[in-house]
């Protein structure tokens, strides 16, 4: 059994170049992302009783499954987390790697599925 859906991979691979366009096909994710990041950050810091304000996720490992272009991975890294992002699309992983490199972020991106980890 696999969680990989080939049609979904093809669909998102075709849109890979648009991941970082806030007015493109991923506009809803860009609009929703700040709320999602805040929610994740608040829950991690609360549950792990973290007091560090500058890098509140320092020392935390994050696995972003289905990371796409890295819209969640990058903010988690900026907050101090050690991030691994996986996606079944090579194109998405390549976009994510290029974007994180431009922004001097150390994120481990892998073209993989959860079952292969």
Where are the model-predicted features located?
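N-terminal, positively charged/glycine-rich alpha-helical extensions of SAM-dependent methyltransferases
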Residues: 1-26
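Short coil-to-beta-strand
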Residues: 8-11, 69, 74
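Conserved alpha-helix/loop element of class I SAM-dependent methyltransferases that forms part
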Residues: 31-58
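Conserved class I S-adenosyl-L-methionine
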Residues: 58-66
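Class I SAM-dependent methyltransferase SAM/SAH-binding core
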Residues: 63, 71-116
């Amino acid at each position: 059994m696999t969680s990989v859906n080939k049609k979904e991979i093809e669909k998102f691979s075709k849109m890979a170049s648009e991941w970082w366009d806030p007015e493109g096909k991923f506009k809803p994710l860009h609009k929703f992302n700040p709320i999602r990041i805040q929610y994740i950050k608040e829950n991690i810091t609360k549950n792990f009783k973290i007091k560090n304000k500058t890098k509140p996720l320092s020392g935390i490992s994050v696995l972003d499954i289905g990371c796409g272009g890295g819209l969640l991975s990058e903010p988690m890294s900026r907050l101090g987390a050690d991030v691994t992002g996986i996606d079944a699309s090579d194109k998405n992983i390549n976009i994510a790697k290029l974007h994180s490199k431009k922004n001097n972020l150390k994120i481990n991106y892998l073209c993989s599925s959860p079952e292969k980890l």
